[in-house]
Amino acid sequence: MKKFVPLFFFLCVGFTFGQKKELKKAEKLFETGDVQAASAILESSAALFDAADDKVKASLTFLEGKIAQSNEDFETAYSKFESLKGNSTVSSQLPQQMTAFSAAVVNSAIADNEAGAFAASASKLYLAYNLDKETNKDYLYYAASSAVNANDYTLALEYYNEL
C-alpha cells in the first residue's frame, strides 16, 4: 500500500505536466502560423484535456477560439470566447482578442458582400453586432441591408425591427 501512494502521486503530477506541455506545443505552433498542426495536436490530446483543471481548460478554450477564428469559423470562435468572459485565467488577453475578432468578422463580411455572398455577409455582420450591441448598431443595419440583397426579407425585417 505504501508503494501505491507515491506512484499515484507521480502519475498525477506527470499527467498535469503532460497537459501543459501539449497545450504549450499547440500554442507555439499556432503562433508560428501552423494552425492545422496546432489543431491536430489539440484533437489528438483531447482525452488528455478532459481531466484538466480550470486554468488549463480556459487556456485550451482560448486557443481553440483563436484557431476557429483563423479558420474563419466565427460562430465557434464566438461561442468559445463568450464562454471565457469572467474567467480570470485569460481575462488580460480576452479584450484584445475580442477586438481582433470583431475586425476579422467585419472584414470577412465585407469580402463576402463584395463577392455577392449576401446571406453570409448578413450573418457575419449580425455576429459583429452581437459582440457589442451598444456601439455596433450600424452593423445591425448593414446586416439587414445584406439580408435584403440576399432576398431574405423575413430576416431583414427581423433585423430592422431589432434596430
Question: What are the functions of these language-model segments?
Answer:
Residues A47, G86, Y129-N130, E162:
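Conserved structural position within tetratricopeptide repeats
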Residues L11-C12:
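Repetitive helical segments and hydrophobic/amphipathic motifs
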Residues K2, P6, T16-A103, N107, ...:
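N-terminal leader/linker segments that initiate helical-solenoid repeat arrays
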Residues E82, I110, S123-Y126, N161:
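A broadly conserved amphipathic alpha-helix scaffold signal in soluble, globular proteins
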Residues I110-G116, A120-S123, N130:
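Intrinsically disordered, low-complexity, charge-biased linker/tail regions
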Residues A37, T76, A120-S121, L155:
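Alpha-helical positions within canonical tetratricopeptide repeat
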Residues D132-K133, D138-L163:
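Solenoidal tandem-repeat scaffolds enriched in leucines and small polar residues
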